[in-house]
Amino acid sequence: MQIQFHLYNTLSRTKEVFNPQDQANVKMYVCGPTVYDNPHIGNGRSGVVYDLLYRIVIKIFGEKTVKYVRNITNVDDKIIDRAELLGVTIDELTDKVTKEFHKNMAYLGCMLPSIEPKATKHTDVMIAIIERLIAKEHAYVVDNHVYFDVLSAPNYTELSNRSLEEMFEGVHVENSKTKKNPQDFVLWKPAKQNESANMNFESPWGLGRPGWHIECSAMSYKYLGENFDIHGGGADLIFPHHTNEIAQSRCAFPSSTYAKYWVHNGFLTVNGEKMSKSLGNFITIRDLMDKQIQGEVVRLFLLSSHYRRPLDYNDKAIEDAKKTLDYWYRAIENINVQKIDLPHDFMQSLLDDMNTPLAVKIINDYAKGVFISKTEEERQLNASAIITCANFIGLMNKTPHEWFNSGVDELYINEFVNKRLEAKKQKNWLLADQIRNQLLEEKIILEDQPDGTTIWRKE
């Protein structure tokens, strides 16, 4: 019996059975970062959500049949402004932020995509698509700008499910006097005076650079063709970015439907408020790394809520994720765990539109099972289910010893343990107790063994 994966499609606003156009060639595109500043925790949520989706699709169809493209936007007005502010070159900024993004994704346990194209390497494809749009009268040139004619696009509002007036209400519109319609968006913009040369490119319309939306249309076309299966991104990209991608791609290639399934993850807030630098609650993934919060803790936090629902970052949520992982790691401690087939109920939770809260509950139930098991065989089966399920969603990639002692200076602690053992030999109980209490203040628990040795663990 074929596995049925139900996935919510923003385009149809329903959960649909995922049926790729070619099961031997499943194609997935996700909007990657604009590399002007260090990625924030919201970017991390997107990275983890689509990493999980990638893992599920691989499980169903096989690793060699799935192509996952995630782009790098390295040409943008924000990049120019940020480089100027920092007094660095465009390349210095984008290279540094791209490397930071890769470190952040590794920290969160995300697999590498199949292909990670950079926008600046694909301006030829962008120009070719823009020329097609002009030829088909879906785009026009004004003062060296090329604009897309929104009113020429059939079903422009389909993805957002709002009227044109609602979509543009309160939206700042640039160069509205030179456009046919105020809603028309830029496909190509001319270079500004004194701008960095490596941010502009030769084109039939003069030196300039692409608009944001055409970049993703071009890179998805280059690597996945006119039609592909999944397009993912944050809910904030539904309009204008994804709406404009659909419009320009379908108009450039009239026989194309572009992406079949549109998947969007929900917003992330911080302590109940929208994340904003002006509010002082802007949290980067680097901030979490510098606090020595383990990546698995952040990943579990990001998976703790259904991907389409809002998620609030706060200290308690991180603390709860840490306690949960401690519980799971404690459950498999000193048990000979083995990889087994993914339990049916766990897999079914993920096949139901990636229901990660239910998946996490199921792992918790297996952990409880370990502690109430009456036989060693039952304990081993529950522990093996924990590690198999957790590994599948990118968690529990350490041994319990590595987990509980992460960030601890083992040489420092072992030195005190040995001093305490020596004190006990000399019956200096006062010193032995002082050492135990000192380590306890540092959240290190000592456990004396029947054979006279002492083991330690983090609280």
Swiss-Prot record:
One of its GO terms (biological process) is cysteinyl-tRNA aminoacylation. Pfam families: tRNA-synt_1e (PF01406). A motif ('KMSKS' region) lies at residues 274-278. It catalyses: tRNA(Cys) + L-cysteine + ATP = L-cysteinyl-tRNA(Cys) + AMP + diphosphate. Disulfide bonds: none annotated. Its main location: cytoplasm. Coiled coil: none annotated. GO terms for cellular component: cytosol. Binds 1 zinc ion per subunit. Its cofactor is Zn(2+). One of its GO terms (molecular function) is ATP binding. InterPro entries: Cys-tRNA-ligase, Cys-tRNA-synt_Ia_DALR, Cys-tRNA/MSH_ligase, Rossmann-like_a/b/a_fold, tRNA-synt_1_cat_dom, tRNAsynth_Ia_anticodon-bd. Zn(2+) binds at C31, C216, H241, E245. The keyword Transferase does not apply. Its EC number is 6.1.1.16. It is found in: Cytoplasm. A motif ('HIGH' region) lies at residues 33-43. The keyword Cell inner membrane does not apply. ATP binds at K277. It is an enzyme of class 6 (ligase). Belongs to the class-I aminoacyl-tRNA synthetase family. PANTHER family: CYSTEINE--TRNA LIGASE, CYTOPLASMIC, CYSTEINYL-TRNA SYNTHETASE. Monomer. This is Cysteine--tRNA ligase. The lineage of its organism: Bacteria, Pseudomonadati, Pseudomonadota, Alphaproteobacteria, Rickettsiales. The gene is cysS.
